[in-house]
């Protein structure tokens, strides 16, 4: 996943989409590919379910446009899980993938914000809608620092959490196509947790605080457990109630553990991918322990 220069390789949106579709075709016996919805610039958002469990754990990345590495790594992770499931191989000689995912399946969403991802990779010309393209150009934001979606909205702060404050007309909670599609998906499934992956220089696991002492203790326990079994060093902390965040929305509405996991993705942080591949399996393994 890295070039000789040490710079991470970021696959195109099309490569991510068709890789997920291909996995759904190749491993159709135990996977299900679907399109969750469309972005504002009419890019389809791919989802791949792996396993035959009745309940689900969500693994999500690519919420902000600047997160250029994790979407490709989640595609790689999906392929690794599918191969291990089909062949009956354990991962790290411990995690029996088929057994775990037939108990609780994983729903992979590697790229929630394809428009922002494409802008950061290929510039404003990647936006097909001329109105959006011109509007965002006029804001004077660097393409490489652009975090929003095709309308310039930060999806990470667009979910209808408690005490959400609308700051501008048209920026009410849940206003964006990507947000609406994910909300519908989260509410359609019986799920047991949300693992939201983001890119940082140092690893950290944040758990969301919500109503109910028992729920909070359970979320804290799971976060501490995952931290204990991680490879790279980092910290664990309670996530401050963040207005409009996906993680806070899930904790409030679905009332299951909601974790934001910050993964180091630079080349010298090679343990980052190992954490990424083990944490979903360890989470499922630990749910009923």
Predicted regions and their residues:
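Short beta-strand-to-loop junctions in surface cap/lid or active-site-entrance loops
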Residues: 46-55
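Short glycine/proline-enriched loop/turn "hinge" motifs that connect secondary-structure elements
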Residues: 50-51, 145-148, 249-255
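Active-site/substrate-binding loop(s) of hydrolase catalytic cores
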Residues: 54, 68-71, 76-216
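Conserved beta-strand elements of the Class I
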Residues: 56-59, 259
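Active-site histidine-acidic residue metal-binding/catalytic motifs
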Residues: 61-66
């Amino acid at each position: 996943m890295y070039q000789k220069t040490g710079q991470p390789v970021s696959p195109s949106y099309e490569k991510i989409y068709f890789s997920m579709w291909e996995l759904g075709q190749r491993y159709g016996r135990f996977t299900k590919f679907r399109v969750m919805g469309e972005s504002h610039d009419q890019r389809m958002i791919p989802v791949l379910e792996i396993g035959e469990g009745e309940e689900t754990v969500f693994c999500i990345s690519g919420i902000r446009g600047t997160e250029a590495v994790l979407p490709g790594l989640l595609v790689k992770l999906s392929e690794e899980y599918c191969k291990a499931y089909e062949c009956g191989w354990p991962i790290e000689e411990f995690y029996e993938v088929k057994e775990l995912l037939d108990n609780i399946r994983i729903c992979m969403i590697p790229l929630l914000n394809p428009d922002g991802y494409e802008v950061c990779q290929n510039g404003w010309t990647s936006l097909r809608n001329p109105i959006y393209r011109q509007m965002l150009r006029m804001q004077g934001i660097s393409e490489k620092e652009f975090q929003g979606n095709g309308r310039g909205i930060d999806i990470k702060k667009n979910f209808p959490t408690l005490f959400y404050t609308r700051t501008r007309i048209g920026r009410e909670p849940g206003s964006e196509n990507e947000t609406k599609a994910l909300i519908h998906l989260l509410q359609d499934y019986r799920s047991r947790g949300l693992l939201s992956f983001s890119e940082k220089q140092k690893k950290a696991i944040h758990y969301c605080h919500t109503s109910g002492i028992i729920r909070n203790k359970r979320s804290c326990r799971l976060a501490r457990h995952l931290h204990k079994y991680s490879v790279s060093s980092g910290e664990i902390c309670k996530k401050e109630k963040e207005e409009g965040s996906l993680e806070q929305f899930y904790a409030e509405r679905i009332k299951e553990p909601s974790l934001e996991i910050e993964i180091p993705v630079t080349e010298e942080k090679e343990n980052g991918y190992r954490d990424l591949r083990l944490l979903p399996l360890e989470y499922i393994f630990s749910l009923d322990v």
